[in-house]
Amino acid sequence: ERIADQSITLVKNKENLLPLTPRKTPKIKLIQITNERLPESGILKEVELLKELLEKEGFEVSYFKDGKYPDVDFSLEDYKKETDLVIYFANMKVGSNQTTIRITWDDFLGESSPKYVCDLPSLFLSFSNPYHLVDVPMVRTYINAYTCNATTVYAMVEKLMGRSEFKGISPVDPFAGLWDTKL
């Protein structure tokens, strides 16, 4: 618990989304990004835990994959009426034989990608890999958690809700030396 609390790092906070409150952003869309083998439900247990904990805080949380997204029959304005905040939960683990991991969006048109960051507040939580900002430089609020387990998810929620301050100091350059990741 102590390690999780002291390691989670607020890398980028350009939107001042934090702390989260159900009054400010009651309806959350949760997007899972992972290279892990999925259980039958299709959702990692840590993602399910995050959803459950946020719901206990008073948020209405739904999975992006279960809903509609902007297209010909469902406008961006309609999407914004049912979504106040998008949370990306990334758990892309590297291995000894695969040291470079890049995000590949699940759907053909990249609907789950952060292409609506100028229209909707978006929060990117990176578990297990501190370099995802390279793939999502447009995201304005980005947090590194370094490992994916229940203890870290609990600690993350405490920080998101403002009950625990971010104490982590990145052991690497999460901006990867790129200018656009800092925007």
Question: Where are the model-predicted features located?
Answer:
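Preference for extracellular/luminal or secreted protein segments
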Residues: 1-183
